[in-house]
Swiss-Prot record:
InterPro entries: 3-IsopropMal_deHydase_lsu, Acnase/IPM_dHydase_lsu_aba_1/3, Acoase/IPM_deHydtase_lsu_aba, Aconitase_4Fe-4S_BS, Aconitase_4Fe-4S_dom, IPM_dehydratase_rel_enz, IPMI_cat
Family: Belongs to the aconitase/IPM isomerase family. LeuC type 1 subfamily.
Encoding gene (name): leuC
Oligomeric and partner information: Heterodimer of LeuC and LeuD.
Lineage, uppermost ranks: Bacteria, Pseudomonadati, Pseudomonadota, Gammaproteobacteria, Moraxellales
Organism the protein comes from: Psychrobacter sp. (strain PRwf-1)
Protein name (database record): 3-isopropylmalate dehydratase large subunit
Record's catalysed reaction(s): (2R,3S)-3-isopropylmalate = (2S)-2-isopropylmalate
List of residues binding [4Fe-4S] cluster: C359, C420, C423
Cofactor(s) in the UniProt record: [4Fe-4S] cluster
Enzyme class label: lyase
Keyword Isomerase listed: no
Molecular functions per Gene Ontology: 3-isopropylmalate dehydratase activity; 4 iron, 4 sulfur cluster binding; metal ion binding
Length: 478
């Protein structure tokens, strides 16, 4: 009598979880092995100090890679001075401490003026440090970005950074599975950023809480790796710690030839495994959300939460449109903070600053998209500052080889050095109170880009068009 093998269909998340499960605990949590640990200057100092105080060494040196990004200056003159060019004392100390700790613990680092330096979530995939099938963590909430490569990736806190350094493992509770499927074809001028903003508008910033989100459907099948990274990057803004896309030929072609990617026989073996990294037919999802690509237009956030977003052709919503009292109260506060009126057309919002960059939209595809809009045109007179900040030294280098820097500079943009920049008020790139900024970043919370600053989340193409007009415009007709 032959044995009968019953194979249960699994989601991608389940496959990755099971492949890295070390042990299950009585309290319902599990011990998970971590393949790649990305470090930066803000959440690592206390972790390294904890290691030193306990007289421990990192468990697996090769699994760790560091680069400064949050606090680094983006102005070239200051950048050329290295760490000493950082004006803020605390920021300077954090970057210096990262350098010192990496030397002390023998951890590889792309230092401030290494051409490979950049935003950690741009550098990881770009260098082939993040590969399909990996578990990836970093002391930063936008680590979900790496899920675009078919990884289980999420942010961790400082105490967890120390735990991973010391043990290469992490105690976690398993999430539920959510599938977000977008079928159809995106219209001209509609990008990955618009897709993820539309998703957040639909499910809300708490919609993905407790879930690992897998993005699937024709839109993602046809989307570039850069676009997939943009979408997975903002899974956290939808409430989920994890966002991911199954592996396909687009993934494998992106990874091929990267500096730290496998080669030869190891490459062939890796590809064979990577091709299994997709959800099985019939796999169970605890929640399924569907969108039609033809319904998605260029998006603009109007308020102080990523879910406060509408099509550029629409208006600031009125209180009468609020679904409940809680939402109405949040909208009222947002009207006041943002200096906007109910029913105000989005295209009437005048802008003071433009920021093209961040771990969401600072890759070469993003810069090409923005450059195609501004070519031969000039930034509007009412825009005080428009800056472009590449996500890494290598993205910047490639953009310069393609002549994109000249297009931006001729239009009136500033061409900056790589870093997190104006995404968050932790470096010299900040908004002044009451300034409106069209930003390609991921969060529009109160004070996110500077005390009293007013952030509007958009795609690179929409930000570029807004810079030229001095207010929001529909890039499809610009």
């Amino acid at each position: 009598m032959s044995a009968i093998t019953i194979t249960t269909a699994k989601t991608l998340y389940d496959k990755l979880w099971d492949a890295h499960l070390v042990s299950q605990r009585d309290d319902g949590s599990s011990l998970i092995y971590i393949d790649r640990h990305l470090l930066h200057e803000v959440t690592s100092p206390q972790a390294f100090e904890g290691l030193a105080l306990a007289n421990r060494e990192p468990w697996r040196l090769s699994a760790n890679i560091a680069t400064p990004d949050h606090n680094v200056p983006t102005v070239r003159k200051e950048r050329l001075e290295g760490v000493s060019g950082i004006k803020d004392e605390v920021s300077r100390l954090q970057v210096k401490t990262l350098d010192d700790n990496c030397v002390k613990f023998n951890i590889a680092e792309f230092t401030i003026n290494d051409v490979r330096q950049g935003i950690v979530h741009v550098v990881g995939p770009e260098q082939g440090l993040v590969l399909p099938g990996m578990t990836v963590v970093c002391g930063d909430s936008h680590t979900a970005t790496h899920g675009a490569l078919g990884c289980l990736a999420h942010g961790i806190g400082t105490s967890e950074v120390e735990h991973v350094l010391a043990t290469q493992c992490l105690v976690q509770k398993k999430s539920k599975n959510m599938l977000i499927r977008v079928n159809g074809e995106l219209g001209a001028g509609v990008t990955a950023k618009d897709v993820v903003l539309a998703i957040i508008a639909k499910i809300g910033t708490a919609g993905g809480t407790g879930y690992a989100i897998e993005f699937a459907g024709e839109v993602f099948e046809n989307m570039s790796m850069e676009g997939r990274m943009t979408v997975c990057n903002m899974a956290i803004e939808a409430g989920a710690r994890v966002g991911m896309v199954g592996v396909d030929e687009t993934t494998i072609e992106y990874v091929k030839g990267r500096p730290f990617a496998p080669t030869g026989e190891q490459w062939d073996q890796a590809v064979e495994y990577w091709n299994t990294l997709h959800s099985d037919e019939g796999a169970h999802f605890d929640a399924i959300v569907e969108l039609d690509a033809s319904d998605i237009a260029p998006q603009v956030s109007w308020g102080t939460s990523p879910e406060m977003v509408v099509d550029v052709t629409q208006y600031v919503p009125t209180l009468a449109q609020a679904k409940d009292e809680v939402q109405a109260e949040a909208w009222e506060r947002a009207y006041q903070y943002m200096g906007l009126e109910q029913g105000q057309p989005i295209t009437d919002i005048k802008l003071d600053r433009i920021f093209i960059g961040s771990c969401t939209n600072s890759r070469i595809e993003d810069l090409r998209s923005a450059a195609s809009v501004i070519k031969g045109r000039k930034v509007a007179a009412n825009v005080k500052e428009a800056i472009v900040v590449a996500g890494s030294g290598q993205v910047k280098q490639q953009a310069e080889q393609e002549g994109l820097d000249k297009l931006f500079i001729e239009a009136g943009f500033e061409w900056r050095e790589p870093g997190c920049s104006m995404c968050l008020a932790m470096n010299a790139d900040k908004l002044e109170p009451q300034e409106h900024c069209a930003s390609t970043s991921n969060r529009n919370f109160e004070g996110r880009q500077g005390n009293g600053g007013r952030t509007h989340l958009v795609s690179p193409a929409m930000a570029a068009a807004a810079a030229l007009a001095g207010h929001f415009v529909d890039v499809r007709s610009f």
